[in-house]
Amino acid sequence: MPRSRRRLPGAGAKPPRREVYWTSQAERDRGHWRQSDRRILARIDRLVEDIPKHPFAGIGKPEPLRYEWSGYWSRRITGEHRLVYRVEGNTIFIAQCRFHYD
């Protein structure tokens, strides 16, 4: 006779839904990539899709920033460019997605 499987509380639960907001600087950066390099724009889109699922792990080698950027995280877009974001509760703020921590 098969044993019944008990579910642990929270097992299989979906992660909380997180809202993503873009700062005006991040919007300008995204517009730059839309016009100049669609491959980088696609990479940014993949990173932004992953952040709500895994804010502090996942693709792009996430790392916490320090000093004046304390509280923010970055992920690698390319060797030169980083996506910088902040997580506050269930809200994610994308600060920039061009250059290296301006």
Tell where the protein language model's regions lie, with residue ranges.
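Enriched for short, Lys/Arg-rich terminal
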Residues: 1-19, 27-42, 46, 59, ...
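Generic structural signal for secondary-structure transition and capping sites
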Residues: 53-56, 70
